[in-house]
Amino acid sequence: MKLCGFDVGLDRPFFLIAGPCVIESEQLQMDVAGRLKETTAALGIPFIFKSSFDKANRSSGTSFRGPGREKGLEILAKIRRELNVPVLTDVHTEDDITEAAKVVDVLQTPAFLCRQTDFIRAVAQSGKPVNIKKGQFLAPHDMKNVIDKARAAAREKGLPEDSFMACERGASFGYNNLVSDMRGLAIMRETGAPVVFDATHSVQLPGGQGTSSGGQREMVPVLARAAVAVGVAGLFMETHPDPCNALSDGPNAVPLKHMKALLETLVALDSVTKRNGFLENDFGA
């Protein structure tokens, strides 16, 4: 798959989707995007900046949702233009899809909406690459149906069918908890789409703080290393310079000051994993 000018797949180094969970201010986004661009360039990691203009699924109705679509897209457009980095944002409605597709390079669908057929069809027909998140309630093999829906919708419009990624972000495990079954990353390869691992939402404790979600950010490196050892096309990680005071998903965000060290480890591990190949492909023979 070709994504934002670079090739992605299990025969290529992983690419990174990263940035703050939500757009808090223009300056914060510019600072984080600039820092991430510098770090990833030094490590040879293809990079896509992400942030949300509207967090439409916050735990509480009083939680900060973002600057809104118009202002948020203006900020993302500025980052794209001035820093020359591709940008990704998530969409929640068909109106979001139409407007965001005019600005960003990649669209992302929320995990909660992966079974909404009309929504998946609409985003697939946007003409943009799409990172489709697996629902916390969905078995890994069921993502094939989701990807197939997207491909069929793209095909109807004469659009490329290889524009979709399948993203793992953990599975519900009782109340207020998620687990990551690493077998799922291998199973999701059966979709034929590049597999992305969301290492930060996978350590979220949904609704675990009453009116907001908790998280275990110290477990992000653990799961990220595991995913890279399994073999993935890309990684998704939210990061913030001050996670304890972030306006959304701070408990599971990577402190920006630690991103370089974490990525250095992951690059080394990714190289070993992909150099030696995937023996599991031969075990059924």
Swiss-Prot record:
This entry carries the following GO cellular component terms, namely: cytoplasm
- The kind of enzyme this is, by top-level EC class, is transferase
Q: Would you say which domain of life the source belongs to? A: Bacteria
Cytoplasm recorded as keyword:
yes
The protein's UniProt keywords, in alphabetical order, are: Cytoplasm, Lipopolysaccharide biosynthesis, Transferase
Q: Which pathway does it take part in? A: Carbohydrate biosynthesis; 3-deoxy-D-manno-octulosonate biosynthesis; 3-deoxy-D-manno-octulosonate from D-ribulose 5-phosphate: step 2/3; Bacterial outer membrane biogenesis; lipopolysaccharide biosynthesis
Catalytic reactions on record: D-arabinose 5-phosphate + phosphoenolpyruvate + H2O = 3-deoxy-alpha-D-manno-2-octulosonate-8-phosphate + phosphate
EC number assigned by the record: 2.5.1.55
One GO MF term, please? 3-deoxy-8-phosphooctulonate synthase activity
Please cite one Gene Ontology biological process associated with this protein. keto-3-deoxy-D-manno-octulosonic acid biosynthetic process
Family label: Belongs to the KdsA family.
**What NCBIfam families has UniProt attached to this entry?**
KDO8P_synth, PRK05198.1
Q: Does the keyword DNA repair apply?
A: no
**Which InterPro entries does this one have?**
Aldolase_TIM, DAHP1/KDSA, KDO8P_synthase
Q: Where in the cell is it found?
A: Cytoplasm
Q: What is the name of this protein?
A: 2-dehydro-3-deoxyphosphooctonate aldolase
Q: Which residues cross the membrane?
A: none
